């Protein structure tokens, strides 16, 4: 479970739902999955410093990201939502895994 924020990238992601994505671990702090297309980032900040359990969009590569560690500020990160669910369940997936992102 989770929620999307009210911004252009989140609205564009919602238009893609439902979508099944393949996530992989990156640097022991985030799970990333390429989206079928890049999202709109109109009016979004140039970068952000996501928190643990944030849902993000990495605009340089068009990836959806679940943060479970501190990555610090990076240009190209947009916070688009937050995960209310079980982050430890995400961590148990050490290799690639598929998940369907859908609207409640």
Could you tell me what each predicted segment is?
Residues 5, 24, 100-102:
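A structural detector for beta-sheet-dominated domains
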Residues 5-7, 18, 61, 69-71, ...:
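Solvent-exposed coil/turn segments that connect beta secondary-structure elements
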Residues 13-15, 58, 72, 91-93:
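A generic structural signal for short, solvent-exposed coil/turn residues
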Residues 80-104:
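Well-ordered alpha/beta subsegment
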Residues 15-62:
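Mature extracytoplasmic domains of secretory-pathway proteins
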Residues 1-15:
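Short, surface-exposed binding/anchoring microloops in extracellular/periplasmic proteins
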Residues 59-83:
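Beta-strand-rich cores of mature extracytoplasmic or soluble domains
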């Amino acid at each position: 479970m989770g929620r999307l924020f009210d911004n252009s990238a989140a609205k564009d992601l919602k238009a893609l739902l439902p979508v099944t994505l393949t996530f992989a671990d990156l640097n022991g702090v985030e799970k990333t999955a390429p989206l079928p297309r890049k999202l709109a980032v109109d009016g979004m900040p140039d970068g952000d410093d996501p928190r643990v359990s944030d849902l993000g969009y990495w605009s340089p590569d068009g990836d959806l990201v679940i943060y479970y560690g501190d990555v610090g500020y990076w240009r190209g990160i947009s916070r688009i939502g937050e995960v209310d669910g079980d982050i430890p369940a995400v961590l148990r997936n050490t290799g690639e895994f598929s998940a369907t992102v859908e609207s409640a």
